Amino acid sequence: MFYSFVSLPEGKMSTRKGVVVYLDDLIDEAIARAYEEVKTRRTDLSEEKMREIARIIGVGAIRFNVIRVQPEKQFVFTWKEALNFDGNSGPFLQYSHARACSMIRKAGEFKRSADASKLTDESEIRLAKVLAKFPDIIESAAEDRRVHLLPSYGHEVASAFNQFYAAVPVLSAKDCRDERITLVDCTRIVLRNVLRCLGMGAPEEM
């Protein structure tokens, strides 16, 4: 699949004018910037682990930032967008996946439950509905060659999940703990599959 021109904030790239960014340099810069972010956020991690996570984030940030745009459209590449942990970006999806993994680890044993009648909060219902769209999104992306649907859907899942996380207690829930943890686990699985389909790593901690 071919993509249109990618520009920099300074303007369009041009080999004639010497305004060129090589992919290897772009990847190295992405990893370096991701490393600084990880080092700030996770001082508890070993140097080796921080660099491992930084590589996953850096490479994924570039892939996501390109794939999220329709192939026929030009776009301007900026580090602020590509490495934004809270926006429409690869790191946001990866961070949401890592958060779900962390919650599952902390939950310990739980009984998988599909009793949707216990999920009555608006944030729970919205997340469940978004997750249910995954098979249709995959089919449309494959059949119509609309790969940009996957990053858009992944962002929708991550946003719904973080709203759910902020709205209701999960690990400390009483009558619906199993149902909510099951919803978290379903989110983890869907985000992992979206990331893998995009050729991105799915870190379990960030």
Where are these regions (language model features)?
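Non-catalytic interaction-recognition regions
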Residues: 1-206
